[in-house]
Amino acid sequence: MTPTGKRRALVAGTVLGSLLLSSCVIGGDNTSAPKGSDTEVSGTITFQTWNLKNDKFTSYFNDLIAAFEKENPDTEIKWVDQPAEGYQDKLSADAAAGSLPDVVDMGPEAAYTLAQAGVLLDLGKADPAAEKKYLDKAWQAMTFDGLGGGTYGYPWYLNTGPSFFNKKLLAKCALDPGKLPTTYDELFDQAGTMAEKCPDEAMIARMPAIETFGEYGVPLMDEGGRKFTYNDPKGVELVERFRELYAKKGLDEEALNNLQTKEVEEFKAGRLAYLPGSSYTLNDLKETAPDVYKDLAIGPRISNGSPNMYIESLVVNARSKHPGLAKAFATYVTNSANQLAFAQKASVFPSSAGTLDDPYFTEDDGDPATKVRIESTAQVREAVVWWPPAFSGSADSETLREQIAQALLGKKSVKSALDASVTYSNDRLEANG
């Protein structure tokens, strides 16, 4: 869950530069021992989340903290929450100022940036026994090959979901609602039919992002995680399919700038046939778009291989005065029982080992929401965190979007557009490495 925006694209390099320059102040090489003990569970630490202090989650976290403090009487956990807007910028600013909280909620992209500047604790070294407590794919998602193979976050929750389709719209546009697409080839073929039969509606309203390339079967980086490679022939093939669809007017110009919120709005309005979503999406459509909900069909996430999933983690500040407490609290929040409770409340999926086997994720009670959850659980078992942690959600994502847009508009070839995007990202990695 990473905020985006053009302003962040402009400042991303500056932020990392300031972090690297300040690393001598905040202990960037992690060689100076913190003041507290590595194992002592006592003292006061700050725990930071983003966009979670609200009517839905406040009581959960208050109870969680109270239970931990009761089990560990010489501890105090101060919980702070930040708004989603500008969250990653604030993380970078706090890290540069030496005021990053002890335990922080973030995804792999933000963690990679801070770990690159030496701000985060390498849990592979500081807490190697923790690895077995989590799904291997989740632990590996927080293990950064490009930074020497260190692991920089305790895995927390995962998210993926099905594809939602408007059956009424499919039938109107000469498509069979009983034959939903499951691969990108099928999706593009059906989108082309829609473009011919229903010029005022569309199948797709989102530009390809880096995870789309992964799901399509494109190699995103080299084996060492130091060079991006998504400009290979398979990557060109993917964007060519979008270009062909755009030429057929199956993807209008507005889609070149669409954010996810616009895509959801179009689906709820009955003008879009396909929406990638999550377990949360079903109830949202039921409550806010009942006319679309009654004609809803649900299929697996579109993929040519392994579907995508997202991961959130809890990282530990390498300069925490109480590293033992910080590690203990982060592992407490992410233990199986607490992950299960949070997943039930937030409509997400646990990363703790064995928790997906709980009946909540496996037993069907006949409710449509339960069916979606069970199918998504099966998808989690096969899913991959396709977004490379070294791929900046601001600078790299914006560059990729802009280059693809130029290719779709005919201002440059698809190959030259992807070459430019890959060159930009690789130059940024080299400059910051």
Model-derived segments and spans:
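Conserved N-terminal structural module of periplasmic/extracytoplasmic solute-binding proteins
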Residues: 2-113, 132, 177, 325, ...
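Extracytoplasmic/periplasmic substrate-recognition and gating elements
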Residues: 66, 70, 171-173, 248, ...
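Helix-loop-helix "hinge/cap" segment bordering the ligand-binding cleft or interdomain interface
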Residues: 70, 145-208, 221-256, 318-324, ...
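Short helix-initiation/N-cap motifs at beta->coil->alpha
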Residues: 81-90, 109, 182-188, 254-268
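Paired acidic/hydrophobic, glycine-rich loop segments that form the ligand-binding mouth/hinge
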Residues: 102-105, 273-278
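Hinge/lid segment of periplasmic solute-binding proteins
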Residues: 108-160, 295-297
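Short, solvent-exposed loop/beta-turn-alpha elements that line the ligand-binding surface or hinge
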Residues: 124-137, 180-182, 196-197, 218-240, ...
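C-terminal capping/gating helix-and-loop segments adjacent to ligand/active sites or protein-protein/ligand interfaces
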Residues: 372-421
